[in-house]
Structure formats: structure tokens, C-alpha cells
A protein has these predicted regions:
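Hydrophobic transmembrane alpha-helices and immediately adjacent juxtamembrane helices
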Residues: 1-251
């Protein structure tokens, strides 16, 4: 059932012209800015660092901006009530949707790497392709679980989309996509290591460099499952409150 729901939503999102533009073109603006900045160092390793980080930024952007307004869109179309009263647990309805959203971020990942190769001559060496792909898959799944939690947290707010947008740029910095964590104060590092994308990004870079990404992969997956469990518990609490106070539609 989860696989069917995931595949259905993935096809719907992939067929959307808006989502396609958002996933491919929009991240290229920020990737180009990063490439131009890092090119000033004249260090090939710096460009590779920026290339990998920019490619994963798009996946985070998808979740931060679209998952936060997921339930709000269902509310606008009048289908939120139908999802809530479905016999399937509400968490099992949302997880395939956010996973499909995160998977669509592969558009951004591929487009950014190709863009960097063609326009800036950035070649990202991948020493271990299998572990590289595994790291990407685990990162996508963990980021999707963050999106699931985020969609539940902001469901009671009319401006959920704005709250999600606020998380996009801080996530780029805190998760180490473009700026090494060593440049930040210690308290920022503690926050960073509580987020799965930080470990996922480290795993991707380690696999590309030929290192061992296993610890980072396991930490990314473990934290993602923790966020998923929190989202499951919170979703039931939110639904009980909405039913009791008749506030699901926010009208």
C-alpha cells in the first residue's frame, strides 16, 4: 500500500510543470551563486565541495517549502477531511507523499551536477558509486521523514507555507551543504548533528571521496526514524485535538 501511494504521488508530482520548473530551474540560481563564490578560491576541492552541497540543497528546499504546506493544500482542495477519516493511519497517508516530494529532488541533484560540469567544468569524482547511491537514498528518506514531521507540526497554522520557507536557508547553512560546520560556533554544531541531512551530506561526501560512509549513513537513517516516530505520535495528537474542537478546516 505504501509503495502504491508513493508511486502514485511521484507520478503526479513528476507530471506537474510547476514542480518540474521548481525542482530543476530554481535551485540552479543558488547553485550558480555558490559556484561563482567558490571558484574564487581556485581550489578544485572547494568546487567539488560546492558541487555536492548544491546538488543536495534542492532536496532540502523541496521538503522545507512544499511539505510545510502539504496539508494546507489538501485543506484548500477539500480533501483533508477525506484523508483524516480514511481507515488507514494518517501517518501512513503522509509519509508516501513527503517521500515522493523528496525523491523529486533528484531532478535538482542531477541538474545541478550537470550544470556545474557544463558551465563551470566541475567534475565530481565518485570513488564508490554503490555507497554514493546508498547515501543519497538514505538521505532522501530521512529528509522525507523530516518533511512528514514538519507537515504535521504546522497543520494548525494558516501560514504554514511561510513557516516552511523560513527553514530553507538556515537548513542550507546548518546542515553543512555549502559552509563547513567548523566555521560555526559549537552550539550550532550541536543543532546540526541533531538533523539527518547533516549526516547524509557527510555520507555522500565520504562515499564520493572513497571513504567509509557507514557511520554517517546509520546516523542519518536513525535520526530520520526518530523524526518519523515523533511525527506519528504528533499526528495522532493533532487529529484528536482537531476532532474534539472541530478545527480541522480552520474555518
Amino acid at each position: 500500500m505504501l509503495a502504491v501511494a508513493y508511486w502514485l504521488h511521484l507520478k503526479m508530482l513528476a507530471a506537474s510543470a510547476f514542480d518540474g520548473f521548481f525542482q530543476v530551474v530554481w535551485p540552479l540560481f543558488f547553485a550558480t551563486s555558490a559556484f561563482l563564490l567558490y571558484r574564487q578560491s581556485e581550489d578544485p576541492k572547494a568546487l567539488v565541495y560546492a558541487g555536492l552541497g548544491s546538488s543536495v540543497m534542492g532536496i532540502w528546499s523541496v521538503i522545507a517549502t512544499t511539505a510545510s504546506s502539504l496539508l494546507q493544500r489538501e485543506r484548500w482542495t477539500g480533501t483533508l477531511e477525506l484523508l483524516v477519516v480514511a481507515p488507514t493511519r494518517f501517518a501512513l497517508v503522509l509519509v508516501p507523499i513527503t517521500t515522493a516530494m523528496a525523491t523529486l529532488g533528484l531532478y535538482s541533484l542531477v541538474a545541478t551536477l550537470v550544470w556545474g560540469r557544463l558551465l563551470f567544468g566541475i567534475t565530481v569524482p565518485v570513488e564508490d558509486p554503490l555507497l554514493f547511491v546508498l547515501s543519497i537514498v538514505v538521505s532522501i528518506f530521512s529528509i522525507a521523514l523530516i518533511g512528514f514531521l514538519l507537515s504535521v507540526v504546522v497543520v494548525r497554522y494558516r501560514t504554514a507555507w511561510a513557516l516552511g520557507n523560513l527553514l530553507e536557508y538556515p537548513g542550507w547553512l546548518v546542515c553543512g551543504f555549502l559552509v563547513p560546520l567548523a566555521f560555526f560556533p559549537p552550539w550550532v554544531t550541536w543543532i546540526a548533528y541533531a538533523l539527518p541531512p547533516t549526516w547524509g551530506m557527510q555520507a555522500i561526501r565520504a562515499a564520493a571521496a572513497g571513504g567509509s560512509p557507514w557511520f554517517d549513513v546509520l546516523m542519518c537513517l536513525g535520526l530520520g526514524l526518530v523524526y518519523g516516530a515523533l511525527g506519528t505520535v504528533l499526528s495522532e495528537t493533532v487529529l484528536r485535538s482537531a476532532r474534539r474542537n472541530a478545527t480541522l478546516s480552520l474555518t
